[in-house]
Amino acid sequence: VSGPVLVLGLGVTGRAVLEALSTRGLDVLAVDDRPGPEARSCAERLSVELVDSPNPTSWTGLVERAGEVVVSPGIPDGHPVFAAAAAAGVQILDESDLADRWDARPRCAVTGTNGKTTVVTLVADMLQRSGLVAVPAGNTDTPLVAAIDDVDADVFVVEASSFRLGHAAAFSASPAVWLNFAPDHLDVHADLAVYEEAKARIWEGVASPGDAVANLADPVVAARAPSGATGFGTPDAACHIRSGILILEGSPVVEVSDMARSMPHDLENAQAACVVAMRAGANLEACAESLRHFSGLEHRMSFVAEVAGVRYVDDSKATTPHATLTAMSSLPGAVLIVGGRNKGLDLAGLANGRPRAVVAIGEAAEPMAAAFEGSCHVVMASSMEEAVMLASEAAAGTGVVLLSPGCSSFDWYGSYVERGRDFQRIVLSLAGDGSP
């Protein structure tokens, strides 16, 4: 490749890519539209030239200097780098393409609008319990280019977001599962069709048709599933629930009553994880043990406390209306705290979740309130404290208060984790002394 590798976007992944390229002695050029202190210090430490993002018309000149362009997740589809690269005949890559080039160890992958991190965590645990060193990577805290530095790893379990799949030159992981599909990230993708197309690339590099794993209960995923795919989620699929037992290809794995989590979405995640883990080298008993012990991840339908007869549930990770509808179907009649920064998604169907009452928060408070208008009691709150107080009043006695925002957190918080922790802090202060 003639010319330096241009790395666009110096978030967690971009910085890991810089590090990986530099330590391998490759010539690198870094660009960030809004470089923060971490980006600057990373470039400085590695002696990499950090170029200010040019105006849209000057991108071609910059890209022509490069041999390849590695694009960080979250760079929107309409970014001028894509047109410039196409015009200059320069290849766009995702970090997974670099990992492919440098490391030949097996990897399996998980994509879907909801449930990715949960299934990655389950698969890694099932493989670990089977005696393999399984390392979660990708959309997690550890980019794949950093994870491959772990010489002890036997297998990588990759969380593959639509951003990563869309940018990859050739995505390769086997087995690979697509969990579900619902509108999301329309602030990044040009439209829904582009988002669906990106997700469908998860199966591009499977070693055999059966390594394409599909949720047949999801109409979009089922319609996209290649011939010979391994299915789950429907009564006649390879993996299904029958008479209260999770069954994989005719073998009973675990009784649902023994599972630590068994809401409807938990059962779909469990089936997906079993299929992927078994095809990646796990054994059935390890899968069963994992499901008996896995109590879920923080901020995903996590029980916080019960105060004065009201249960509080933190589902801050729900950043799409689809995720919030899933949460409401698991907790019918809950008082819902909902809102934040909407990612260009349609809120119209949310009222179908039929909450007892709604407290709308954040930038999207007004459109959220409008979405539920007429279906239940709706109020708006201007802080999380106020939201919890209002929700507690509405749930008084025997109810459930569910924080499931259906939006990103970036209006009031730095992340969904920060938002969830704030909610937990407020709830626990109610539990502690009865006052906020």
Regions of interest found by a model, annotated:
Residues 1-94, 98, 430-433:
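N-terminal leader/targeting and accessory segments in enzymes
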Residues 11, 34, 140, 218, ...:
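Residues in the short beta-alpha loop(s) of Rossmann-like NAD(P)-binding domains
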Residues 21, 69, 110, 139, ...:
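Residue-level signal for inorganic ion chemistry
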Residues 27-33, 212-216, 337-339, 354-364:
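Short internal beta-strands
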Residues 32, 52-54, 93-97, 135-138, ...:
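Beta-strand->loop->alpha-helix junctions that form or flank phosphate-binding loops
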Residues 37-50, 345-400, 435-436:
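C-terminal helical cap/extension that packs against the catalytic core
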Residues 58-64, 73-216, 220-229, 425-436:
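Phosphate-binding loop of NTP-binding sites
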